[in-house]
């Protein structure tokens, strides 16, 4: 990741020029494969790796996580059912807090699931009815030396009122 410069409002307002800084204490990488399946739907396999360490002025959970997942879906079409199914498993190590005094690495083993079923109606304004279900593991014992809470890595893309696209 890159730390954008300048990052001070006065310097931005003055149109100051500064080189961006690369943050080598956070590394994110991945592999992605997509395939048109024999019955016409789409399938995806993916792997994401995250390795982050504390740096001066920025404390982290020191996450060293691997996420593997599978997604199957059919794109919405008029007068036809569509769906999306996704499962992901996450493993590695992380810490309970970003505090510099927290030096205990916790085992990290979690999972996530998503299911969606929709139908697009034949009408001038193209209405679509959809039902969604998400599940993610949680940490049932915060003092057992394990972190069982699924980590979205960089936060939810949309959390205000679900996938309404209002904002």
Set out the residue ranges of the language-model regions.
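Signature for the C-terminal beta-barrel architecture of outer-membrane proteins
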Residues: 1-146
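Flexible glycine-rich, low-complexity coil/linker segments exposed to the extracellular/periplasmic environment
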Residues: 144-167
């Amino acid at each position: 990741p890159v730390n954008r410069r300048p990052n001070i409002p006065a310097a931005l307002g003055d149109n100051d020029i500064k080189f961006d800084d690369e943050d080598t204490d956070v590394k994110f990488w991945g592999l992605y494969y997509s395939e048109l399946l024999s019955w016409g739907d789409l399938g995806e396999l993916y792997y994401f790796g995250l390795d982050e360490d504390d740096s001066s002025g920025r404390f982290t959970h020191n996450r060293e996580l691997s996420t593997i997942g599978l997604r199957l879906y059919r794109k919405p079409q008029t007068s036809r059912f569509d769906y999306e199914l996704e499962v992901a498993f996450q493993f590695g190590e992380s810490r309970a807090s970003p505090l510099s005094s927290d030096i205990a690495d916790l085992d990290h083993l979690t999972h996530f699931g998503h299911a969606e079923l929709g139908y697009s109606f034949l009408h001038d304004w193209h209405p679509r009815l959809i039902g969604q279900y998400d599940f993610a593991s949680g940490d049932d014992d915060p003092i057992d030396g394990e972190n069982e809470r699924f980590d979205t890595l960089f936060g939810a893309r949309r959390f205000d009122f679900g996938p309404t696209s209002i904002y």
